[in-house]
């Protein structure tokens, strides 16, 4: 499994800036690096690529929003890149929403004309008040504090991995579960298969 972490603050254009091809959450250098990392992970045959994305990917377009909804041109650019380069085994661990949620790809496809659904996982908040940010999410949303997410990856050395995401609330236990598998990108149209929710 290949984990890729990005910084969406230090090189970002203000969310209040007018939408354009130059408006960016990543900045030019990091975006080029990120795209190359996706290609490298695909070409290396990793069964799963996990993007640790500090901000919610799923969100309606809204100028000034701090999620990817405030940078829709760049989000579409990245989604088109993911689709065009057959990065079919990408899952996102997203931050900056104070709640538990997951999406199985139903609401996460921002490529022009479709073709780039990704699994999105949210596991928070430890101490902050609960809130819902972005969405909708196919697995629902559980806002609140004293929560966390666990992504378990089972690898038997074969060409695929099995994954289970569990959203937990301290004192109450499991609030949501999403089980999926990942196979090397390019091996099929959708290398992430949803097993159960």
Which residues make up each language-model segment?
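Metal-dependent phosphoester/phosphodiester hydrolase catalytic core
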Residues: 1-197
């Amino acid at each position: 499994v290949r984990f890729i972490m990005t910084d969406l603050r230090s090189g970002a254009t203000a969310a209040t800036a007018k939408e354009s091809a130059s408006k960016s959450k990543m900045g030019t250098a990091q975006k080029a690096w990120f795209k190359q990392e996706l290609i490298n992970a695909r070409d290396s045959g990793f069964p799963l690529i996990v993007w640790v994305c500090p901000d919610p990917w799923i969100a309606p377009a809204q100028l000034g929003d701090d999620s990817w909804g405030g940078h829709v041109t760049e989000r579409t650019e990245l989604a088109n890149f993911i689709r065009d380069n057959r990065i079919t085994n990408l899952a996102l661990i997203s931050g900056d929403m104070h709640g538990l949620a997951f999406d199985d790809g139903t609401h996460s496809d921002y490529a022009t004309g479709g073709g780039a659904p990704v699994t999105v996982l949210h596991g928070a908040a430890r101490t902050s008040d609960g809130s819902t940010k972005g969405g909708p999410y196919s697995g629902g949303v559980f806002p609140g504090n004293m929560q966390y997410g666990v992504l378990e990856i089972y690898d038997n050395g074969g060409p695929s991995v099995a994954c289970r995401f569990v959203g937990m609330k301290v004192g109450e236990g499991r609030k949501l579960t999403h089980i999926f598998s990942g196979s090397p990108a390019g091996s099929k149209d959708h290398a992430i298969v949803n097993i159960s929710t």
